[in-house]
Curated annotation (Swiss-Prot):
It comes from Methanosarcina barkeri (strain Fusaro / DSM 804). Its cofactor is [4Fe-4S] cluster. Pfam families: Oxidored_nitro. Involved in the biosynthesis of the unique nickel-containing tetrapyrrole coenzyme F430, the prosthetic group of methyl-coenzyme M reductase (MCR), which plays a key role in methanogenesis and anaerobic methane oxidation. Catalyzes both the six-electron reduction of the tetrahydroporphyrin ring system and the gamma-lactamization of the c-acetamide side chain of Ni-sirohydrochlorin a,c-diamide to yield 15,17(3)-seco-F430-17(3)-acid (seco-F430), the last intermediate in the biosynthesis of the coenzyme F430. It catalyses: Ni-sirohydrochlorin a,c-diamide + 3 AH2 + ATP + H2O = 15,17(3)-seco-F430-17(3)-acid + 3 A + ADP + phosphate. Keywords: ATP-binding, Iron, Iron-sulfur, Ligase, Metal-binding, Methanogenesis, Nucleotide-binding. Homodimer or monomer. The Ni-sirohydrochlorin a,c-diamide reductive cyclase complex is composed of a NifH homolog component CfbC and a NifD homolog component CfbD. One of its GO terms (molecular function) is metal ion binding. Gene3D superfamilies: Nitrogenase molybdenum iron protein domain. This is Ni-sirohydrochlorin a,c-diamide reductive cyclase complex, component CfbD. One of its GO terms (biological process) is methanogenesis. Belongs to the NifD/NifK/NifE/NifN family. InterPro entries: CfbD (IPR017675), Nase/OxRdtase_comp1 (IPR000510), Ni-siroh_cyclase_CfbD (IPR052673). Its EC number is 6.3.3.7.
Amino acid sequence: MAEKEISIIHPRPSSIVAALYTLRDLNVDVAIMHGPPGCSFKHARLLEEDGIHVVTTGLDENNFVFGGHDKLVQLINKSVELFNPKLIGIVGTCPSMIIGEEMHDAVLEANPDVPVIEVEVHAGYHDNTKGVLFALESALDAGIIDHKEFERQKYLLEKATEVEKKFGAASREYLAPSRGDVKYKAAQRVIQLLKEGKKGLVIMNAKKETGYMFADITLAVNEVAEALGNKENLINMANIDPELGLPRVRQHAEYITRDLKAHGVEVHEIIGGMDEYPIAGEKVSELIKEKYSDFDFAVISGVPHAIPMENIKNMELISITNGPRQVLPLKEMGHEYVLVEIDLHPKTLGVSGIVESEFGATLREVAKEA
């Protein structure tokens, strides 16, 4: 018998926003939102920090009744005039999709001399990964990605949804947000373990650009271990394969690899690409079973709940997420410390190098007192 779908009552990520971020990863120059002026304002503004122009047709009550075709045609032409883009994305919103706007007709009428990725999406999907899938389907139709990459991305989206429903913020009707454990206490514990000569895994399983801050945790643990003379007791794992993912995602992996090397941090095990966070945990589990089953502790950053507990359940686990609703599920899985990098996402947009994390900064300061 199929499991009954739970009715989640805490706010969930938007498919519209997911489509916007996917267009960013495809390196569009302009993203046009066909909807009201305030739709997805926060994320649209943040994406401008990441190097793309986000504009809106600004549909009003009159357009909700009579349509916004002409506005979209005009904005496509205006975007070409202002920004001289090489690739344009257009994203639907709830009103434009409800009234049945034909975005493709507007593209045909404007006839820009550049490829256009049209994403017919609204926010009424239970899984925000629908927005990603629709954007990728349109990118495939436009010849921006090939069928092999599309199928790879589709598989990753299915696994990401599965992970969230099993162990993440979609695993129950309501999860209260939490700031997690005190970072000072967790830092003290990591330092104590290092001082005692315990063997530790430092695992980064990060989602795309969030890796710019989660990589700092890897960096900080290694810096402290080196200062204590126990760096050889650490094994670093990270999902930073620069050959995998959409263009922007591969670039993130290159930059993080560069910065870790510059600081003398060796990544002993590459566990996947930066979009493979839903499946990299299986690779981690296999590696631990084969080579690292006798290790004492693990510092896991990014998406810790995607790493199966089977081969880490006997280790002391210190995990760092950027999801306030992820604290309780991780605690219930068996993670002793769960920390939240609450302002991570805004700080990792528009950057091209590792950004200091709260836990990394805390660990460095506490180590000075040790």
